[in-house]
Amino acid sequence: MTWYALQHKPAQGNRALAHLQNQEIICFYPKITVEKIKAGKRTKKLEPLFPGYLFVNLEQTDPMWSKLRSTRGVVRIVSFANKPAAIPDDVIQHIKDSLHTVAEQGGIKPGQHVELDEGPFKGISAIFQAYDGEERAIVLISFMQKQQTVKVPLSTIHPRRSGRSD
């Protein structure tokens, strides 16, 4: 079986997913938790990783192909030269692994104070800015009376223990 991408109607990803699953089609609709500030309050919301798209796993000879486009919420099958674009299994697995990594990284948020464990900045406090891929982070450190942005391995930072001030 092979993975393919489907485009769904705006704001109807969950509807398309439910109808596809009702037809016993194997689906993958990757979502991540995002933190947003709305009306001055931080809220966490689950959002699609690829807005407007979900993935299905089918054989090319599967009779379900003809039903895909008429499934509620589905717009079209992503195709090139009128042929559905196959997505390699390893790409889907990488997306799944990345979702797991993103969930694990959820412990450190932008603006949070962190401490560096290794390298030339060992023992220095910093402010976490962002993730830079799966294995690096961007932090802001005070260095020679200046704020400096530095990229460091994610494994070298941890949330700063409370009770300590700089």
What would you call each of these model-derived segments?
Residues 117-125:
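Short coil-to-beta-strand transition motifs
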Residues 1-115, 127-133, 138-166:
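Acidic-enriched and Gly/Ser
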